[in-house]
């Protein structure tokens, strides 16, 4: 953000573009709020539920929300999973040199701490229309705790689907397609060639995701459809025509 003036701008723009009228957006694995807080600012008629399991990141997230007077944001120190309870989550100090964007249940750390686990069904609201999940391979467990929300088929879902966690990606695709959602590939660069500050040295670096659209919601971003759970994400910007508006060819 400091170097390029943006982070995951494409992902944020997509979510904002879907946020017509009013509603609730749930951000699971919100980190320090790089998506949740700009969304809350750009969509003041929406409520944002930001969930973060790491104590330090949660503290920064809450402070950022208050400092920026984003009163339409609720911040929860919790993990999201298949059932309500208590779990052990890595307790890495913010002073450590670590990629906190990759921190999750599978991370190897010397210490853990007990945090509460919630389900999306208990925390989400009736007007939930957008859900973003980025939990480093734990996505299927989060969806197991969202059976009611999934069954209502009202929300648009943006879920991380990386090559580092192919089994989790396959399960996520299978869950959505089994419930009648249309599933698409979505690639979001960390920074784009049209960034406000310095252009990125590696404009292709970014996060792989899937988008699940409920019945009746149009594919307005011309996303590439996922054929099935075993498919690998296509490479190259031509598979993601929406990237052209950000300087990709």
What are these regions (language model features)?
Residues 1-64, 68-71, 107-109, 185-194, ...:
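S-adenosyl-L-methionine
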Residues 3-26, 86-91, 102-153, 164-167:
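Short internal loop-to-helix segment that lines adenine-nucleotide cofactor pockets
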Residues 39, 61, 89, 142-146, ...:
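Hydrophobic packing residues within well-ordered alpha-helices of enzyme cores
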Residues 53-54, 136, 160-163:
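Short strand-turn motif at the edge of the Rossmann-like AdoMet-binding core
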Residues 58, 62-94:
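Core alpha/beta nucleotide-donor-binding catalytic domains of modification enzymes
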Residues 66-68, 90-96, 150, 169, ...:
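Short, hinge-like loop/turn segments at secondary-structure boundaries
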Residues 76-78, 181-190:
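Conserved S-adenosyl-L-methionine
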Residues 155-158:
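Proline-aspartate-enriched helix->loop->beta-strand connector
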